[in-house]
Amino acid sequence: MLSKDIIKLLNEQVNKEMNSSNLYMSMSSWCYTHSLDGAGLFLFDHAAEEYEHAKKLIVFLNENNVPVQLTSISAPEHKFEGLTQIFQKAYEHEQHISESINNIVDHAIKGKDHATFNFLQWYVSEQHEEEVLFKDILDKIELIGNENHGLYLADQYVKGIAKSRKS
């Protein structure tokens, strides 16, 4: 049986994952409207992935006979200065989500909630992967530059990542 504390934290995490999905959808739209179709595709796909993260949490809560408490999702940022800023914000956002997951893991350990701890290990691994991914993209964008041809090359690099993640 899940403790009230874990239930509260998991419900909050569902909403954080939904917010993540909206943020990446907003970033994707900005990229598409600035002819950065590669980054747009990557972020669009990533928005769907974040939505799947929320669904996975919902299923876990439902399996434990816990009602999910969805809250209003605030409007995500939609004005950006450029590709570097988008991926910097995305990287920082992933770090924030990792902190949130780690906090729930800590509570599960303290409460000796082995089932929740085990369930969350997938998220711990996923967050590590996402932080590495976004940091790598950010590093490549900064290396290539985002002026003139560099912006095009950076967009193509991100497009390649998006396509490779689909296969």
Curated annotation (Swiss-Prot):
This is Bacterial non-heme ferritin. PANTHER family: BACTERIAL NON-HEME FERRITIN, FERRITIN. The keyword Oxidoreductase applies. Was originally thought to be an adhesin. In PubMed:1556073 only the sequence of residues 1-12 of strain 5294 was determined. The lineage of its organism: Bacteria, Pseudomonadati, Campylobacterota, Epsilonproteobacteria, Campylobacterales. It catalyses: 4 Fe(2+) + O2 + 6 H2O = 4 iron(III) oxide-hydroxide + 12 H(+). It is found in: Cytoplasm. One of its GO terms (cellular component) is cytosol. Disulfide bonds: none annotated. GO terms for molecular function: ferric iron binding; ferrous iron binding; ferroxidase activity.
